[in-house]
A protein has these predicted regions:
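Membrane-helix boundary/coupling elements in multi-pass transport proteins
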Residues: 73, 96-110, 213-226, 248, ...
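Helix-loop-helix junctions that connect adjacent transmembrane segments
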Residues: 3-9, 46-47, 121-124, 156-289
């Protein structure tokens, strides 16, 4: 079975592309650099924050897997929300998700450009940013195979980097590196205990870490452009547990075991660079910079791919301009790619010409979109599963302990959103995301009413 929205696109992704994408889809710059801020806030108890956020992602991916295996579709959860909840839900979450990845494009381009500018200071920052964005846009315009090939090698480098870090970290922890400044695991408890800043700090860290997992769901979008999407999605969903445990929990455990959580370097230069420097690895900064460059370039590549596919899917359903449906001879949605890139450039332009508050609002508006996506996936699975069971369909891939665990997941997401609204450091994100969501819902209702009215007029004539 395959969804309607994926039929017009090429099935150019090979098994190794989807496999590597699923393995490394959760690895971003947030792990290599951003995790240092979470550790500095929560101490060793940040492990609990990552475990809680990781558990949520595992449950959401299981729900998404149940729907995607039954009906693979380029629109993924947006299409399922359309079917299970209503047109307004699919319209809203589809556009919010597109907006999230459009914002990611300039942010990741600037992050990559900053690293390259540090190596080659004679070249302006904007030139590197423009060059990287245009190069990856051209790559995505050619064929989906190009995206898959780039992501395969990006993902392989990220995986090798983490495995290398874990191996070096374990060797140092067991005292087999004579030149190392750190060894053992005493820092888990010897600096004001395991939870030095209390449960509130762990909760705050969980809110931060939760967004580092955004991108896990991309495999369900990409798999629709492979020859056996159901099989690919099943593999990706079943492997998400060990991926999160290995890449996040094990690597973060090594960081908090080897380095005191209150070491200023964690927040200043990042967790990986701090640990490698303390172990005595030569050129630790250069090594981490290369890995981060690969990670942010990979994220930029995925942002271009994901935003274009979501826009294409919205267009196929009549929820976006019809021109976004157009494809090349290689069955690539080139107009959707160009429109997404153009929107990203408009965001950059707004940063320069609009008041600072405008761009701050644009950034804040994406703050809670990840949680809204997870919430929509859970509600869609709850309703779609009930609908399928009522029709007597055989469900090959099931969410565990349905419906109890689905309801528990929904309650947890709502609770996290409520906590974000109560905390001053996250309230702006909730307000901005809520305002944007209301605007998108209103636009969707207006579009659908006009379409229904036009349809009635056509029937009357």
């Amino acid at each position: 079975m395959s969804g309607n929205n994926s039929n017009d696109l090429a099935q150019g992704l090979k098994q190794r592309h989807v496999t590597m994408l699923s393995i490394a889809g959760v690895i971003g710059a947030g792990l290599f650099v951003g995790s240092g801020h979470a550790i500095a806030a929560a101490g060793p108890a940040v492990l609990l924050a990552y475990a809680a956020a990781g558990t949520l992602v595992v449950l959401v991916m299981r729900m998404l897997g149940e729907m995607a295996i039954a009906s693979p579709d380029t629109g993924s959860f947006s299409t399922y929300a359309d079917r299970a909840i209503g047109r307004w839900a699919g319209f809203t979450i589809g556009w919010l998700y597109w907006w999230f990845w459009v914002l990611v494009i300039p942010l990741e381009a600037n992050a990559a450009a900053a690293i390259l500018h540090a190596w080659f200071p004679s070249v302006d920052l904007w030139a590197f940013s423009l060059l990287i964005t245009l190069a990856l846009t051209l790559t995505n315009l050619c064929s989906v195979k190009n995206y898959g090939e780039f992501e395969f090698w990006f993902a392989l480098l990220k995986v090798l980097a983490i495995i290398g870090f874990i191996v070096v970290g374990c060797i140092a922890m067991f005292g087999f590196v004579p030149s190392s400044q750190v060894s053992g695991a005493s820092h888990l408890f010897d600096t004001q205990g395991f939870m030095p800043n209390g449960l509130g700090a762990v909760l705050a860290a969980m809110l931060t870490t939760m967004f580092s997992f955004m991108g896990t769901e991309i495999v369900t979008i990409a798999a629709a452009e492979s020859k056996d999407p159901g099989k690919q999605i099943s593999r990706a969903t079943n492997s998400v547990i060990w991926r999160i445990c290995l890449f996040y929990l094990v690597s973060i455990f090594l960081v908090v075991a080897l380095v005191p959580w209150n070491d200023p370097a964690l927040a200043e230069v990042g967790s990986y660079q701090t640990v490698l420097s303390r172990i005595g690895v030569p050129n630790a900064k250069l090594i981490v910079d290369i890995v981060v460059l690969v990670a942010v370039t990979s994220c930029l590549n995925s942002a271009l791919y994901t935003s274009s596919r979501m826009l294409f899917s919205l267009s196929k359903r009549g929820d976006a301009p019809a021109i976004a449906q157009r494809t090349t001879k290689a069955a690539t949605p080139h107009v959707a790619v160009l429109l997404s890139t153009a929107a990203a450039f408009l965001c950059v332009f707004a940063n320069y010409v609009a008041p600072a508050q405008v761009f701050e609002f644009l950034l804040a508006s994406s703050g809670a979109i990840a949680l809204l996506v997870y919430l929509v996936i859970a509600v869609s699975q709850l309703r779609m599963r009930s609908q399928r069971e009522a029709r007597g369909e055989k469900i090959a891939f099931k969410m565990w302990l349905f419906p109890g665990l689905t309801w528990a997941t929904i309650a947890f997401i709502v609770a996290v959103l409520a906590v974000m609204a109560l905390r001053e450091d996250h309230r702006a994100e909730i307000i901005a995301t809520a305002l944007l969501s209301i605007g998108v819902v209103a636009a969707g209702l207006l579009v659908h009413r006009k379409r229904e009215a036009a349809g009635k007029v056509a029937l009357d004539n």
